[in-house]
From Swiss-Prot:
Listed name of the protein: Alpha-conotoxin TxID
Chief localisation class: secreted
Note: Negative results: does not show inhibition at neuronal alpha-4-beta-4/CHRNA4-CHRNB4, alpha-4-beta-2/CHRNA4-CHRNB2, alpha-6/alpha-3-beta-2-beta-3 (CHRNA6/CHRNA3-CHRNB2-CHRNB3), alpha-3-beta-2/CHRNA3-CHRNB2, alpha-2-beta-2/CHRNA2-CHRNB2, alpha-9-alpha-10/CHRNA9-CHRNA10, alpha-7/CHRNA7 nAChRs and muscle alpha-1-beta-1-delta-epsilon/CHRNA1-CHRNB1-CHRND-CHRNE nAChR.
UniProt-reported outcome of changing S30A: 46-fold increase in selectivity for alpha-3-beta-4/CHRNA3-CHRNB4 over alpha-6-beta-4/CHRNA6-CHRNB4 nAChRs
Post-translational modification: Unmodified Met-32 is essential for toxin binding to rat alpha-3-beta-4/CHRNA3-CHRNB4 nAChR. An oxidation of this methionine provokes a 13.3-fold decrease in inhibitory potency (IC(50)=245 nM instead of 18 nM). Owing to its potent activity, derivatives of this toxin have a potential in the development of a novel drug. Unfortunately, the oxidation of the methionine is readily to happen during toxin synthesis and oxidation steps as well as under oxidative environment in vivo, which should still be considered to find a solution to this major drawback.
Function text: Alpha-conotoxins act on postsynaptic membranes, they bind to the nicotinic acetylcholine receptors (nAChR) and thus inhibit them. This toxin inhibits alpha-3-beta-4/CHRNA3-CHRNB4 (IC(50)=3.6-18.38 nM), alpha-6/alpha-3-beta-4 (CHRNA6/CHRNA3-CHRNB4) (IC(50)=33.9-94.1 nM), and alpha-2-beta-4/CHRNA2-CHRNB4 (IC(50)=4550 nM) nAChRs. The toxin competes with agonists in the orthosteric binding site of alpha-3-beta-4/CHRNA3-CHRNB4 and alpha-6-beta-4/CHRNA6-CHRNB4.
InterPro entries associated with the record: Conotoxin_a-typ (IPR009958)
Length: 37
């Protein structure tokens, strides 16, 4: 187990969550993204 890796993954998933929220509020991006809805 590598603590630095875990922190990096947390940061990455937080960024992904933010991007996902932004994308899913945009009709075109939301339609193209399977994780929206």
């Amino acid at each position: 187990f590598d603590g630095r890796n875990a922190a990096g993954n947390d940061k990455m998933s937080a960024l992904m969550a933010l991007t996902t929220r932004g994308c899913c509020s945009h009709p075109v991006c939301s339609a193209m993204s399977p994780i929206c809805g």
